[in-house]
Structure formats: C-alpha cells, structure tokens
Amino acid sequence: MSAPQLNKIAANSPSRQNPSELETAVAGALYDLESNTADLKAALRPLQFVSAREIEVGHGKKAIVIFVPVPSLQGFHRVQQRLTRELEKKFSDRHVLIVASRRILPRPKRSSRSRNTLKQKRPRSRTLTAVHDAILTDLVYPVEIVGKRLRVKEDGSKTLKVILDEKERGSVDYRLDTYSAVYRRLTGKNVLFEFPLVSAEY
C-alpha cells in the first residue's frame, strides 16, 4: 500500500500497522475517490477510517462496515450518500455502511473501594445502551428514526422494531435486511426495520 493510501487509516488504529486485505482495498478506494473526483476531493482529504469489516447479511450477500473516528463522523455525513454510492460501485454486490467507532465502558462496580477510586463518572455516551442506539442511527443515516418498539415474545426473546421515516422508503427499502443483519452482528440484538403503516384512504 502506498503512503498516501495508508494515510486514509487513522494513525491510532491498530489496522494502520497491519491492515487486512479489505482495509487495504477500502483505503485505496477512498484515496482514489479523493484524487480523481473533483467534488469529493476537499471533503475526503481530512477523513480517515479506523477499520473495516465484511459481514454476511444472508442470501449469499455481504456488507462492508467502515468504522470511522467519532470526531470525523460529521465529515463523512456531509458526503455520505455520494460516497457510499461510489464505494458500492467499486465493491460490487456489497452494501457499504459507515459507523462511528465507539467504546463501551463497563458499569462501575458497587464496592466502596471502587467508588472511592473512581476518578470520573462514566459518560452516558459510553454506556452500552447509548452506544447501541448510536449504532442504529449511524446505520440508517441519513434516514430519520421516527419510533421504536420493543417486542418481547413468550420465550423471553426480544426484538426491537425500528420505525423509519416514510419519505425515505424508496431509497432504503432494499437495504433493510442489511441493516438488521449488521446490527445483530455488531450488538447481538435482534432488530426489525420497517416503515409506518399507512392506512388506506376511502
């Protein structure tokens, strides 16, 4: 991998020292778009990613999840629709998803000693619930989540139903299975994405 391509991987990422074949391909694709696509050049130049994973989404299909530093997420969002379109041309038959790389901090122990030695309170953004909610938002961006329902079956299993903005149905309908499979793989939780039921007009 050339030095300019390697620079697309964040300096503090373990992948920078030993990138996988997929990460090498993603770095090359980002650098190629930055070099050869005039309207993406300025936006992509400062952006780097942390790692990339390929995830099976069923029916023999795969998705590529690109993990990016949290401070860079806004920069990716500004060009995300165009960027994912261009990347999906390069990685044919695979959906490309961009998710911020977040750390979950463990819940503090209840012992008095740990309470006394705890220097700083755990930020809410580092809790398991907050990180899983943020992953949901990242996966479906720029589509807005308009509602959530937790369905508990008789056997105790839980499925989260996520309602997406009806206005975006045409642009993401074909990606819903990918969103569900990737979320399950990243969090271990079942999720079902759907759109509001529109009552028929009489």
Curated annotation (Swiss-Prot):
Name of the protein this chain belongs to: Small ribosomal subunit protein eS7
Disulfide bridge partners, by residue number: none
Main location: cytoplasm
Disordered, as annotated region: 1-20
Similarity comment: family membership: Belongs to the eukaryotic ribosomal protein eS7 family.
GO molecular function per UniProt: structural constituent of ribosome
Compartments it resides in: Cytoplasm
Keyword Hydrolase attributed: no
A Pfam family reported for this protein in Swiss-Prot or TrEMBL: Ribosomal_S7e
PROSITE patterns the UniProt entry points to: RIBOSOMAL_S7E
GO annotation (BP), single: rRNA processing
Biased composition (Polar residues): 10-20
InterPro entries: Ribosomal_eS7 (IPR000554), Ribosomal_eS7_CS (IPR047861)
Protein role: Component of the ribosome, a large ribonucleoprotein complex responsible for the synthesis of proteins in the cell. The small ribosomal subunit (SSU) binds messenger RNAs (mRNAs) and translates the encoded message by selecting cognate aminoacyl-transfer RNA (tRNA) molecules. The large subunit (LSU) contains the ribosomal catalytic site termed the peptidyl transferase center (PTC), which catalyzes the formation of peptide bonds, thereby polymerizing the amino acids delivered by tRNAs into a polypeptide chain.
Entry keyword set: Cytoplasm, Ribonucleoprotein, Ribosomal protein
Quaternary context: Component of the small ribosomal subunit (SSU). Mature N.crassa ribosomes consist of a small (40S) and a large (60S) subunit. The 40S small subunit contains 1 molecule of ribosomal RNA (18S rRNA) and at least 32 different proteins. The large 60S subunit contains 3 rRNA molecules (26S, 5.8S and 5S rRNA) and at least 42 different proteins.
Keyword Cytoplasm: yes
GO CC term, one of those recorded: small-subunit processome
